[in-house]
Amino acid sequence: MLPFTNMSGDAEQDYFADGVTEDIITGLSRFRELFVIARNSSFTFKGQSVKVQDIGSELGVRYVIEGSVRKMSSRIRITAQLIEAASGNHLWAERYDREIEDIFAIQDEVTETVVATLAGRLGDLGVDYAKRKPTHSLTAFDYVLHARQLIYRYERESILEARELLEKAIALDPEYATAHSWLSEAYWAEWLGGWTVIADASFEKSTQAAAKAVVLDDTDPQVRIQMGQLCLNRRQYDEARSHFDKALSLNPNEPNGSMMYSYYSTCIGDSERAVAQINEAIRVDPLGHYGYMAGMAHYTARNYDQAIAAFKIVRGEAQSGLAWLAACHAQSGGLAEARAAAAEFVARATKAMADMSVPPPSSWRAFFAERHPYKHQDDMDHLLDGLSKAGLE
């Protein structure tokens, strides 16, 4: 499904068109009979003029959905077309010209019609899910759509702005599970990135928000994934696996579920399954960014060449990947490369923290040990040994 084009004449409304697209992708993904490409890959075509035949070939899909969104005060117009990729033929097209309050119904109708056209019928789960209205407040819905796009940037300032929007959404509708889930994600990102002076407080707030989201809606895959990663970092391995299993049963096309299951498998020492799960995430999201998780899986399996290749891909995206790259080089005997990667990591991480007025940790080894919950001590020692050999203490 391609990103719907924002036809509102206001670039600031891009987040709304993107959010509508993402919600429909999520709805379609929950049907096992459909193979649905994830948001990360489909959004790489945003703003580009590309033939559907080329998109179908690059992503390995038979059908493409495209459309547009025009938001006008209290009204909204959405167009959608289902196209056969190989031929370019339109299988279905519709225009929805409604009151803005009908946005959830429109998303449901697009999802149901696409599934009915391709599969011939709707499953019970799809019907139940499609009829669920996430919130009674359109303003809260708008806040969540905006916050979601800010969180995707994974920058400290955007995370703080997203938190404010999500708090506003929750104030308008305290039972809006999705808002609580994304608030948990925002605090999690703050903790994981080291963007807070009091790390434990951010982690605890993330846990509280996720727990609230699960109580409000335990059938949301994103909520389950969020709870799973929090349980994993608390070393609650059985609980983490239960949440990841549930997430994938609710949405088998969710690449984040496969990615986090890969990370869970890495942490418990099941490297074979970790690699298999990250490959599944890449299958559903071929243009996504999974080098970091793939690198950790290969490092833990002592496959250093594969790990180095993976971490080199994310070198410019995730500065902590440089520390892992340094450990990989150190364990494979490339001490010069290890020291260079370690030095680059320290320089970039220290600058980033200084820009945020956050002091660097007294021990980088302790920093990584806290954030990577290995179940077996030999795997943890293996990571810390690699960091030490690279010069990170």
Q: Where would I find each of the regions flagged by the language model?
A:
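Terminal, low-structured helical/coil segments at or just beyond the last alpha-helical repeat
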Residues: 359-393
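TPR/TPR-like (Sel1-like) alpha-helical repeat modules
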Residues: 206, 315-319, 330-353
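Alpha-helix boundary recognition
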Residues: 29, 56-57, 312-315, 346, ...
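Acidic, proline/glycine-rich low-complexity intrinsically disordered segments
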Residues: 2-310, 321, 328-332
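Acidic, Ser/Thr-rich low-complexity linear motifs
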Residues: 130-133, 196-197, 351-371
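Short beta-alpha connecting loops at secondary-structure transitions
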Residues: 292, 321-323, 365-369
